[in-house]
Amino acid sequence: MKTFSAKPAEVKRDWYVIDATDKVLGRVASEVARRLRGKHKPEFTPHVDTGDYIIIVNAAKLRVTGTKETDKKYYRHSGYPGGIYETTFGKMQQRFPGRALEKAVKGMLPKGPLGYAMIKKLKVYAEAEHPHEAQQPKALEI
């Protein structure tokens, strides 16, 4: 029996919607990364993007455990000397709801062209509405 290798043109992608209300950041991120990569499918092939599209709604209502609301820090740099910026999870959720989830999922995906293609299939929305009703997404419970 030959080893099966999925072809990019043969991959069937489904659309799923996840409600992140009162869900823990890391638990949602790990499951989303697994599904974006396609590891839940029997035809998973490491060098082919076999994952599904994931829509996350109510990202503003995501939570973290313990004191991570104030203690978890995110860093970025402007490129200039002394241009480092830091923000906490709580401030990031207020200013850009959903960005913390995007960063968590992106860190769990492969680096390189394949990972960049996978992260484009993630759609995050702060509120309950999303513009992807035409794709008829299935509800996914985590």
Curated annotation (Swiss-Prot):
GO cellular component: cytosolic large ribosomal subunit
Alphabetized SUPFAM superfamilies for the sequence: Ribosomal protein L13
Residue intervals passing through the bilayer: none
GO biological process: negative regulation of translation; translation
Keywords for this protein: Ribonucleoprotein, Ribosomal protein
Listed InterPro entries: Ribosomal_uL13 (IPR005822), Ribosomal_uL13_bac-type (IPR005823), Ribosomal_uL13_sf (IPR036899)
Pfam families reported for this sequence: Ribosomal_L13
Coiled coil: none
Any one GO MF annotation of this record: structural constituent of ribosome
Function text: This protein is one of the early assembly proteins of the 50S ribosomal subunit, although it is not seen to bind rRNA by itself. It is important during the early stages of 50S assembly.
Family recorded in the similarity comment: Belongs to the universal ribosomal protein uL13 family.
Subunit structure: Part of the 50S ribosomal subunit.
Name the UniProt record assigns to this protein: Large ribosomal subunit protein uL13
